Amino acid sequence: MPSLPGHEIIGTRMVGEMPPVELVDMWIRVTSAVVKHGFEIRYRDLEPPRTGTFNGLHIVLDPDVDFEMQCFILLHLFGHSVQWVAPALQPKLKFLQCSDDKEEFLMHLRDYEFEAARIGMRLLHSVGVTQLDQWYSDFVETDWRYVERFYREGEIPPWEECRASSCPVITPCDIPELEHREVEVRFAF
């Protein structure tokens, strides 16, 4: 079945169904903005299940991950990178590192994940990409379901079982001042 141009698609798009032209335009704008915020973007073959890493100075993507997922991972890891190098956000990170209570940890983890998502949404808007809010929000919720299941069940769930659609749209937040420094490598899976 031939795919329709983006302007002919009616309704929301599901995660995994973004038209390539929109992805390429977004990619060009977002990669430029990530670099202008002081982060280097690299490609490297990562050990599965890792799909991307960040260390406060650069964001690494696995080239074997499909392009739509790379777009999301870059936005999301940009958000996490900002969290780790923005002095204003440092106090929030301690809750992730010192909780023995699983439910409390998951609550803080959700806050952390969605704050990164709000930062990613701000980056999208700052480069003039405002028509993909629902796509990004659905990807964020899908990612959260995936991460939460991993922490609850102890194994990586099938991505398809976590897919979400028509989720509440993520509200962007400001990108605070950054002080770039190397931090412990963290990864997406």
Regions found by a protein language model. Name each.
Residues 84-118:
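Post-HEXXH active-site segment of zinc metalloproteases
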Residues 8-70, 78-85, 89-90:
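Active-site scaffold of zinc-dependent metalloenzymes
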Residues 1-3, 189:
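N-terminal secretory targeting signals
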Residues 50-53, 89-92, 107, 180-188:
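Anionic, Ser/Thr-rich low-complexity intrinsically disordered regions
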